[in-house]
C-alpha cells in the first residue's frame, strides 16, 4: 500500500541524502505508517514513534529505535521506560518544562528529555 506517508518519507530521505545528513538524523513521527515507511527506506536509521499508543514490545517488533512519548503517556505507563530498555529501545519524553517533572523523568531513567528550558534541565543534571 503506497500512500502519502510513503511519498513524504521518500522525499525527506532524498533531501537528507542530498545534504549528506541522513546518518546524523533521527526520524520522529506520530504515524506508525510513516515510521514503517522510513524503516523501509533506511533500515539502519534511528526512528522513534511519537503517538504513545503502543507498548515497547510492539515498537521492538516493528524494528524501530525507540519511543518518544509525551509526559502524560509515560506518567500513565511508567513501567514502559524499563520495558523499553529491556527490549533495547531508547526512550525520549516531551515536553518537560518544570523542575519537578524533570526530576521525575530523570529518576525514571529516560534517555532523552525534550524541553523548552534546557538551562533548567542542565542544572538538574549537575
Kindly give the residue locations of the regions a language model identified.
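Short loop-to-alpha-helix "cap/lid" segments that border enzyme active sites
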Residues: 1-126
Amino acid at each position: 500500500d503506497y500512500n502519502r506517508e510513503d511519498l513524504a518519507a521518500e522525499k525527506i530521505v532524498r533531501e537528507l541524502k542530498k545534504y549528506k545528513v541522513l546518518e546524523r538524523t533521527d526520524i520522529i513521527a506520530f504515524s506508525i505508517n510513516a515510521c514503517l515507511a522510513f524503516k523501509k527506506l533506511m533500515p539502519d536509521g534511528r526512528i522513534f514513534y511519537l503517538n504513545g499508543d503502543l507498548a515497547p514490545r510492539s515498537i521492538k517488533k516493528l524494528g524501530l529505535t525507540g519511543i518518544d512519548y509525551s509526559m502524560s503517556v509515560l506518567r500513565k505507563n511508567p513501567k514502559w521506560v524499563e520495558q523499553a530498555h529491556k527490549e533495547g529501545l531508547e526512550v525520549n519524553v516531551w515536553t518537560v518544562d518544570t523542575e519537578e517533572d524533570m526530576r521525575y523523568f530523570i529518576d525514571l531513567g529516560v534517555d532523552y528529555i525534550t524541553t523548552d528550558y534546557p538551562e533548567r534541565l542542565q542544572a538538574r543534571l549537575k
